[in-house]
């Protein structure tokens, strides 16, 4: 899921780095970071090497494969770039090491969405879906359970967050798009697309079904069997009716579908909208009256990490929050 344009979760005063490059040059360290590639920037790796003296190696995977790798091959990476929805699948494996909040220099400056479950103005955040605060902390450093209240042990250090909506081709839609329900409007039969990453796409589907008045959810992130059945029934019928041009799973698929005009309205991520515009094609990330589907990601530590690798991971995390990234 992508957000090169997402806001940094902890922009703080510059982090002064002294002496580290020389130390690590004598005893080379490489941190292998597994993730979707959303935050895998070569410029970031180069700057980290200049400032910290060790190598960053990205392992780019699909969202589903990030979860599979974290659960089945935790020794194959040194840091995990995980989206928050993935944590409910990963933490029960015991493969995630609680991150010591006391070692995070800018901990007190992290946006309270992640540390208190509130907006900066103190207003409580929605608890629907995978609200970050519900999966932000572990009971202990080595635990398979989330803490009910903030603890010393963080699951991941939040790095980026954003809110997704529908992308549209305003030159082809022929009318204003105002609601999630428009994704299944008969006007766009054969010209709509939805995200085919189940844990995310089902939330887009829920936004659509509720906007249509087909389903009223108690909690979209913890649906009842009846709610699931109703949601799937709506999608199945739409597919039978030929509503969907495609079900996309990868960033570039969504860009190509929209840029080519094969799709007029679809689930989309903000950098994909930018990529379409860069081709000279009009594309709008459309605000909708029901609101957005929010998401976030962060850096976590696999349970096997220790010694200089663990020390380097904390150095990188503190550097990441220092402002340059």
Segment roles from a protein language model:
Residues 165-172, 208, 296-309:
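A bilobed periplasmic-binding-protein/Venus flytrap-type ligand-binding module shared by bacterial periplasmic
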Residues 26-93, 255:
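Early extracytoplasmic/lumenal segment of secretory-pathway proteins
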Residues 1-19:
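N-terminal export signals
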Residues 54, 73-81, 95-97, 188-191, ...:
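Alpha-to-beta junction loops
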Residues 243-305:
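Extracytoplasmic/periplasmic substrate-binding proteins
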Residues 55-62, 81, 223, 242-251, ...:
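Short beta-strand-to-loop elements that line the ligand-binding cleft
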Residues 179-188, 298-325:
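Bilobed periplasmic-binding protein/Venus flytrap-like ligand-binding cleft at the lobe interface
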Residues 39-42, 91-253:
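Extracytoplasmic ligand-binding site segments that recognize negatively charged/polar headgroups
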């Amino acid at each position: 899921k992508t957000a090169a344009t997402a806001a940094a979760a902890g922009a703080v005063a510059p982090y002064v780095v002294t002496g580290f490059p020389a130390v690590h040059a004598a005893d080379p360290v490489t941190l292998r970071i597994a993730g979707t590639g959303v935050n895998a920037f070569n410029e970031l790796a180069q700057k980290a090497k200049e400032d910290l003296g060790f190598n960053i190696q990205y392992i780019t995977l699909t969202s589903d494969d990030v979860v599979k790798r974290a659960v089945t091959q935790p020794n194959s990476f040194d840091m995990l770039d995980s989206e928050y929805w993935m944590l409910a699948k990963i933490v029960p494996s015991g493969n995630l090491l609680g991150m010591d909040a006391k070692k995070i220099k800018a901990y007190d400056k992290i946006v309270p969405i992640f540390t208190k479950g509130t907006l900066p103005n103190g207003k409580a955040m929605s608890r629907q879906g995978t609200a970050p605060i519900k999966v932000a902390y572990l009971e202990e450093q080595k635990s398979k359970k989330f803490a009910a209240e903030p603890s010393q042990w963080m699951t991941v250090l939040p790095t980026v967050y954003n809110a997704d909506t529908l992308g549209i081709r305003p030159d082809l839609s022929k009318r204003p798009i105002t609601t999630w329900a428009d994704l299944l409007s008969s006007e766009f039969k054969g010209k709509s697309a939805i995200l085919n990453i189940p844990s995310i796409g089902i939330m887009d589907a829920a936004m659509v079904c509720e906007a249509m008045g087909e389903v009223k959810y108690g909690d979209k992130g913890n649906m009842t069997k009846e709610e699931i059945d109703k949601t799937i029934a709506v999608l199945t019928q739409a597919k039978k009716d030929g509503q969907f041009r495609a079900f996309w799973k990868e960033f570039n698929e969504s860009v190509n579908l929209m840029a080519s005009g094969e799709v007029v309205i679809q689930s989309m991520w903000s950098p994909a909208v930018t990529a379409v515009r860069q081709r000279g094609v009009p594309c709008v990330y459309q605000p909708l009256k029901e609101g957005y589907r929010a998401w976030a990601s962060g850096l976590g530590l696999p349970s096997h990490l220790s010694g200089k690798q663990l020390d380097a991971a904390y150095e990188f995390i503190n550097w990441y929050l220092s402002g340059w990234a």
